[in-house]
A protein has these predicted regions:
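Mature catalytic domains of secreted/periplasmic carbohydrate-active enzymes
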Residues: 1-171
Length: 171
């Protein structure tokens, strides 16, 4: 499950298949990604549907400013309620994206991001959700994006080759 600052604007175009877009050879393909969690990358393509939507709704607001809104929403978040809902659907496991390509960690990490110190959640969303999920008899898995991190390379990523070039290789 992706639940990040990109959930605040919660927008992505719904009329494209990412596989088809990448095969098209269009150097801007991922700028038209149908995935909300790619919102920040899509903003880097000025004529993308995300960038157009963002300008119309949020003006020149920076993507990272959505983190404050997202964290404010945590005040009413109940991980046990979520876990109960997942269990009621018959789910046997829950996989949480603990850090997506935007670089924001969903736990208070003791290892600061050298490019953006403090870009992490004050609340331990990962630990709390994991505990609640297990308490409801389900397995808990995590996904961590280590290869792509837009705090290290903020160039627009339109094709797979851009993603490969953006993988941090050390300073």
């Amino acid at each position: 499950m992706h639940w990040t600052a990109a959930s605040v604007p919660g927008f992505a175009p719904v009329d494209g298949d990412v596989g088809d877009m990448l095969q098209s050879g269009d150097p801007r393909a991922m700028g038209w990604s149908p995935y909300t969690e790619w919102y920040e990358n899509s903003l880097r393509f000025p004529d993308s549907p995300v960038a157009q939507h963002h300008r119309a709704v949020y003006g020149d607001r920076d993507y990272r400013s959505f983190v404050a809104d997202w964290e404010a929403g945590l005040a009413s978040w109940d991980p046990d309620e979520w876990a109960a809902t997942f269990a009621a659907t018959g789910a046997r496991y829950v996989v949480l994206v603990t850090k997506h390509h935007d670089g924001y960690c969903l736990w208070p990490s003791s290892v600061p991001n050298p490019r953006l110190p403090g870009f992490q959640c004050a609340r331990d969303v990962v630990g709390e959700l994991g505990e609640a999920v297990r308490a409801h008899g389900m397995r808990f898995g995590v996904y961590y994006s280590g290869g792509l991190d837009w705090t290290f390379d903020d160039r627009p990523m339109g094709q797979l080759s851009d993603m490969i070039r953006a993988i941090p290789r050390g300073d």
